[in-house]
Swiss-Prot record:
The UniProt record lists the keyword RNA-binding: yes
Gene Ontology BP terms: ribosomal small subunit biogenesis; translation
Self-association state and partner proteins as the record states: Part of the 30S ribosomal subunit. Contacts protein S5. The interaction surface between S4 and S5 is involved in control of translational fidelity.
Phylogenetic lineage: Bacteria, Pseudomonadati, Thermodesulfobacteriota, Desulfovibrionia, Desulfovibrionales
NCBIfam families: PRK05327.1, rpsD_bact
Residue ranges annotated for the S4 RNA-binding domain, each copy included: 98-161
Family: Belongs to the universal ribosomal protein uS4 family.
Protein name from the UniProt record: Small ribosomal subunit protein uS4
Organism: Nitratidesulfovibrio vulgaris (strain DSM 19637 / Miyazaki F)
């Protein structure tokens, strides 16, 4: 599937839930989904009979859009999760959570996953002391993500840290704000992911 270049708020309305694609704005009364919580288009308010397949597809699309992953890569993640020990759905979410761009967002060094992805590509962060510029890199327990001294005055990073102070950091991560440093304390567990996701629908979709 190609990149989706339409307005982010339309994505939220299409999926029927907030995807938090605009970072802190999604927590304010400026959120477009709060004003129009129905699908975009002329028939957005119409009630339709939805098939099981459509429900499964929408759930998959929702998760893809939350993490900013294209179809081919998402399918690859599912295959990897299916081959690993444990529950496939939980494995899939753990893989997505361990992406470097997501971890940077969770640590509060970016206001959204998209912003985190852009910052990573520009080489703003280091991983275990080395420059990391691949957003899809998988972090491991003990990894240290840091903003080098030269990049600490970037306005978007300072603004994002103010947001994370209000929003909080997941228990599997540890952030030292004054030092602009984050540590992966453990692997993410299913209960660490608070966003409403029914991963079983995705497993059913790909198992057909």
């Amino acid at each position: 599937m190609a990149k989706y270049n339409d307005a982010k708020c339309r994505m939220c309305r299409r999926e029927g839930t907030k995807l938090f694609l605009k970072g802190d704005r999604c927590y304010t009364d400026k959120c477009a989904y709060d004003r129009r919580p129905y699908a975009p288009g002329q028939h957005g308010r119409a009630r339709k009979k939805v098939s099981d397949y459509a429900v499964q597809l929408r759930e998959k699309q929702k998760v893809r859009r939350v993490y900013g992953v294209l179809e081919r890569q998402f399918r690859g993640y599912f295959h990897k999760a299916d081959m690993a020990k444990g529950v496939t759905g939980a494995n899939l979410l753990a893989i997505l959570e361990r992406r470097l761009d997501n971890v940077i967002y969770r640590l509060g060094f970016a206001n959204s996953r998209q912003q985190a992805r852009q910052l990573v590509r520009h080489g703003i962060f280091t991983l275990n002391g080395r420059k990391a510029n691949i957003p899809s890199m998988q972090v491991r327990v003990g990894d240290i993500i840091e903003v080098p001294e030269a990049s600490r005055k970037i306005p978007v990073i300072a603004e994002a840290q103010e947001v994370i102070a209000r929003r909080g950091c997941p228990s599997w991560l540890e952030v030292d704000g004054p030092s602009f440093k984050g540590t992966v304390k453990a692997l993410p567990q299913r209960e660490d992911i608070q966003f409403p996701i029914n991963e079983h629908l995705i497993v059913e979709l790909y198992s057909k």
